[in-house]
Design a protein with these regions (language model features):
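A conserved helix-loop-strand patch within extracytoplasmic ligand-binding domains
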Residues: 107-156, 255-256
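Short, polar/charged alpha-helical segment
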Residues: 40-65
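Bacterial signal peptide processing site
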Residues: 22-25
Length: 272
């Protein structure tokens, strides 16, 4: 009787260990079922149309989980509810890690929609005049992008001692046109564009507002830390599935997709 009980116990332990190993495999480096955060905008759409089919051909099953904003997307990624996202640049991710105690890692730059100066009441950069009113985004990373772009246009000069990725309105040292700036939520800018002489908006806002990107009067020179990235948890960065996603973005199939479908919206990072 004791022998039977011992055998039964041993079998039960073996079964539990096997189940544990199976669970580890499902959640480990070689897993084939992946969950990603998604939102309305060009980046999720680009992934789903141009990258997802490449991964599915390799046997992956991919499930999108809708998120209301990027902060929520990073929280659920950091907590392990999703495996990756493709909607943020390095500057945003690093700010999240610092402010929220995150442990996220950027893997590879991916196509990015640049910020631009777009028409408001005026439709030509040459129409700039004293006292003109310009709308710019109010979140830190995109505010800096906006002022860097306005400097590129020659309308202001920023303190050269400051990092362009962190400049604010306070860093303007020359404003020859005495321009007025209103910093506001990016999503709200397109709806009030005719209240301003010019507006500065990011690519995702251009896309969501269905603004023709070819109407941009000037676009930014995208700094490396403002390129969109494939982002995962730090502990997953060496997983095979992460490499496969990165490889898909750099594949011949994806390049062909971009050549066919890029209508002037996307800046595509150069291969190193």
């Amino acid at each position: 009787m004791k022998l039977r009980k011992w055998i039964a116990a041993a079998l039960a332990i073996t079964a539990l260990l096997a189940a544990g190993c199976g669970s580890q495999s499902d959640n480990g480096a070689d897993k084939k079922e992946l969950v990603y955060s998604k939102s309305q905008g060009p980046y999720s759409e680009l992934f789903e149309q141009g990258v997802k089919p490449i991964l599915e051909a390799k046997g992956y099953k991919l499930v999108g989980k809708d998120m209301s904003d990027l902060l929520q997307a990073d929280v659920v990624l950091n907590d392990g509810e999703v495996d990756f996202n493709v909607e943020q640049h390095t500057a945003y991710m690093e700010n999240f890690n610092q402010k929220q105690g995150g442990k996220l890692a950027a893997i590879t730059p991916i196509p990015t929609v640049p910020a631009g100066i777009y028409p408001g009441k005026k439709s030509d950069l040459k129409e700039i005049a004293a006292g003109d009113h310009i709308a710019v985004p109010n979140d830190a990373a995109n505010t800096a992008r906006a002022y860097a772009l306005l400097q590129k246009a020659g309308w202001i000069k920023l303190n050269p001692q400051k990092d362009l990725s962190t400049v604010t309105q306070a860093d303007i040292i020359e404003n020859p046109y005495n321009l007025r700036f209103t910093e506001m939520k990016s999503l709200n800018i397109p709806a009030v564009r005719t209240d301003f002489d010019f507006i500065v908006i990011t690519g995702s806002i251009v896309y969501n507002a269905k603004i023709n990107p070819q109407t941009a009067l000037l676009t930014e020179d995208i700094l490396p830390h403002l390129l969109l990235q494939l982002v995962v948890r730090e502990k997953d960065k060496d997983a095979k599935w992460v490499k496969d996603i990165a490889d898909a973005y750099h594949s011949v199939e994806f390049k062909e997709y971009m050549q066919k479908n890029n209508k002037g919206l996307w800046y595509v990072p150069e291969e190193k």
